[in-house]
């Protein structure tokens, strides 16, 4: 009793007891692990000093390694892209606890672009039946958000439950559709008159086009946010370990440790979040686009 009274034993909810002697953290898959591994190891040392336990870092070549690792308890937490994070949540029950802050935001906006002189396209629904350019089938703002919205709002129906059904829905609902390969390529198809619409991000024209080309385009509509990278923890991690890990990672937001974070993925800060708050709505678009989950995982497979 006296130990508690004298504050020698801390019984508050913010208890600093980490009930495991080691944790393993996964990173976004890369082709050449060496470059990222050295940066990840700086984080490893930092977390070891903050938590007082052994921390292992794993830089895989694909997300399946992380998903299986989380499912079977070999990986406790991981930095992830939005799409794979949602798939991991669906398959293993892992939860997002932190979101990356990039240029002051935890998301960017998916936007529909057309030529300034084209007055026939004024809503997302107006793109149905037109010649459209997506970035890629796994592109968040360039495909998942616009196509997912068209499906959830009932403008396009997918008959079936696989990637073939999704591709058939595209063929049935657009005069033509192209996966251009990126923002710039999609915008160039639009500028060249090959398509009526290009899907992408809110800042794609100013980032990839000269001013004289930027003025030839207009944003039709902003469809909604695409969430930033997240930090996920496994469903089996205890509350106390999770809280301590989150607290330690938030220390990276302060000047003295911030370079550890910015060197990893260019994020300025990590902010607390939940799966539902950060990815929830975006996740529903992945779910309705049949067969897309495997495409998303394949896209990030750097071993192939």
PLM feature segments, named:
Residues 26-29, 59-63, 73-92, 98-101, ...:
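Beta->alpha turn/N-cap motifs
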Residues 64-78, 91-92, 125, 169-171, ...:
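Short helices/loops that flank or line small-molecule/ion binding pockets
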